[in-house]
Amino acid sequence: MSFISYISFKGIKMNVISDLELQQIRTQMLTFAQLQVNQADLAEDLVQEAFLSAFKNLANFKRQSAFKTWIFAILKNKIIDYLRQKGRFVLESELEDENTNNSFFDEKGHWKPEYHPSELQGEEETVYSDEFWLIFETCLNCLPAKQAKIFMMREFLELSSEEICQETHLTSSNLHTTLYRARLQLQNCLSKKL
């Protein structure tokens, strides 16, 4: 039974999402989960748990936000629960050294001239387009693993700086440096691809 059929079966009218859109959301959720847990099978399990939870709680979906926003919030909570259960967010052994593969900066931490970011230009609606999010995902995947995970913890999982520092054993200064570099690299990548 498809998700749309299931919704119809439950008597919930939701004609704003098709099976194709649902598959696209699922793919995005899987990518998001894989960035956090770094294991394809585990990411798949978390996405399935998020969908199962959504199925069980469809009657509680008040449509105050988009379906995608709602189900991503469920996934974020599942990931946070898993990571807290495991007692870690990022294992040092899973991370690349911050200086490894970081070709955007010189040894003093300054931008290399060829990679210095330009200002993002363009229409506001670019941020909301599917193309933007595909490019963003590509740029995010180009970040070193440590930067990508910490960026996702802060911006997508919305964890506080204190919580991230506690879980990753980073100092506040190192955290802010890592986030700053991640944002700059994302800005550089996006400015070249948009």
Swiss-Prot record:
SUPFAM superfamilies for the chain: Sigma2 domain of RNA polymerase sigma factors, Sigma3 and sigma4 domains of RNA polymerase sigma factors
Motif segment (Polymerase core binding): 45-58
Coiled-coil ranges (or none): none
MF annotations from Gene Ontology: DNA binding; sigma factor activity
Keyword Nucleus: no
Residue ranges of DNA binding: 161-180
InterPro entries linked: RNA_pol_sigma-24-rel (IPR014289), RNA_pol_sigma-70-like (IPR039425), RNA_pol_sigma-70_dom (IPR014284), RNA_pol_sigma70_ECF_CS (IPR000838), RNA_pol_sigma70_r2 (IPR007627), RNA_pol_sigma70_r4_t2 (IPR013249), RNA_pol_sigma_r2 (IPR013325), RNA_pol_sigma_r3/r4-like (IPR013324)
Keywords linked to the UniProt accession: DNA-binding, Sigma factor, Transcription, Transcription regulation
GO BP, sorted A to Z: DNA-templated transcription initiation; regulation of DNA-templated transcription
Assigned protein family: Belongs to the sigma-70 factor family. ECF subfamily.
The protein's name in its UniProt record: Probable RNA polymerase sigma factor HI_1459
Protein species of origin: Haemophilus influenzae (strain ATCC 51907 / DSM 11121 / KW20 / Rd)
